[in-house]
Amino acid sequence: MKFYRDHTWPSTLEEAIVIQEKLRDQVITEDQLEEPIQYVAGVDMGFEADGTISRAAVAVLSFPDLQVIETSLAHRPTTFPYVPGFLSFREIPAVLDALEKIQTTPNIILCDGQGIAHPRRLGIASHLGLLIDMPTIGVAKSRLVGKYEELAETKGSSQPLIYNGETVGVVLRSRTGVKPLYISSGHRISLPTAIDYVLRCTPKYRLPETTRIADKLASAK
């Protein structure tokens, strides 16, 4: 997969904040999809050697039948510390390496992390989507910002995730009786469409098949 890689990576949190505040207004939260949707991908991260080596995994699946088409794995030295709200600077360099290895270009990428449900509206899904100019969805296992009402236990139940008076995502029950996921637009996709594709990618488990398979790859020893 080819894309234009041009980005300055910060060395301090102050520099990272400047980049996030500069990029946040470029995020598109309306549908700009290339249809028909034939391929969906998941990206996830793991770390080796006490966090000094980043390991990024990409899994590309056919859609809607969710069969694995291609996977890739990339390693590189970790150059940014672990700080909540700034994980994209720690993780994206290796993710870009992994994406460059795949031959099949996905129509949508589901990221293990936040989209605009972020203090500066630029979680890893939004940041990555901007860098490669592709539709991305934030699929997080935990909440970073916002409040929400309790939701029903059945699959498909959801509640708006509200932050500073604005809906930045939804809390979505992807499987009956399990903990919910935190879904937000990444880039070039609306929230309703993001919810639809997350549910269509979760036929059996809590996580979408895309990120579930990428998580297994990234977590492998």
Swiss-Prot record:
Superkingdom assignment: Bacteria
Residues holding Mg(2+): 44, 112
Annotated compartments: Cytoplasm
GO CC, alphabetical: cytoplasm
Keyword Transcription regulation recorded: no
A Pfam family recorded for this sequence: Endonuclease_5
Positions of the record's site feature: Interaction with target DNA: 82
GO biological process terms on file: DNA repair
Enzyme class: hydrolase
GO MF entries: deoxyribonuclease V activity; magnesium ion binding; RNA endonuclease activity, producing 5'-phosphomonoesters; single-stranded RNA binding
Cofactor(s) for this UniProt protein: Mg(2+)
Signal peptide, first to last residue: none
Keywords: Cytoplasm, DNA damage, DNA repair, Endonuclease, Hydrolase, Magnesium, Metal-binding, Nuclease
Catalysed reaction equations from the record: Endonucleolytic cleavage at apurinic or apyrimidinic sites to products with a 5'-phosphate
Protein role: DNA repair enzyme involved in the repair of deaminated bases. Selectively cleaves double-stranded DNA at the second phosphodiester bond 3' to a deoxyinosine leaving behind the intact lesion on the nicked DNA.
Protein family membership: Belongs to the endonuclease V family.
Protein name: Endonuclease V
Taxonomic source organism: Nostoc punctiforme (strain ATCC 29133 / PCC 73102)
